[in-house]
Amino acid sequence: MKNLLICIIKMYRKYISPLKRPSCRFYPTCSQYSLEAIEKYGALKGTLISIKRILKCHPFNEGGYDPVK
C-alpha cells in the first residue's frame, strides 16, 4: 500500500502538477511532505498526516516552513 501511494504522488508530480501554477504555501511542498510522511510513518498514519497538511494549504494560512516531524 505504501508503495502504491508513493507511486500515485510521483505520478501527480510528474503529470498533473506541471499543468497548474505553483500554489503551495509551505516548504516542503505538500506533495513532498506527503512523500516524507508516508515514508516515515507508513501508509495509514502518513496519509492522515498528509491530509491534515493539505487542508491547511489555503490562502488564509500563512504557510512557511513545516517539515514532517
From Swiss-Prot:
Task: State one Pfam family annotation.
Answer: YidD
UniProt key word Secreted: no
Predominant place of localization: membrane
Q: Which GO terms describe its cellular component?
A: plasma membrane
**Membrane topology, record value:** Peripheral membrane protein
Checking InterPro entries in the record gives: Membr_insert_effic_factor_YidD
The entry's localization annotation reads: Cell membrane
- Which key words tag this protein in UniProt? Cell membrane, Membrane
**What role is this protein assigned?**
Could be involved in insertion of integral membrane proteins into the membrane.
Q: Which NCBIfam families match?
A: membrane protein insertion efficiency factor YidD (TIGR00278)
Q: Which family does it belong to?
A: Belongs to the UPF0161 family.
Q: What is this protein called?
A: Putative membrane protein insertion efficiency factor
What species was this sequence derived from?
Answer: Clostridium botulinum (strain Langeland / NCTC 10281 / Type F)
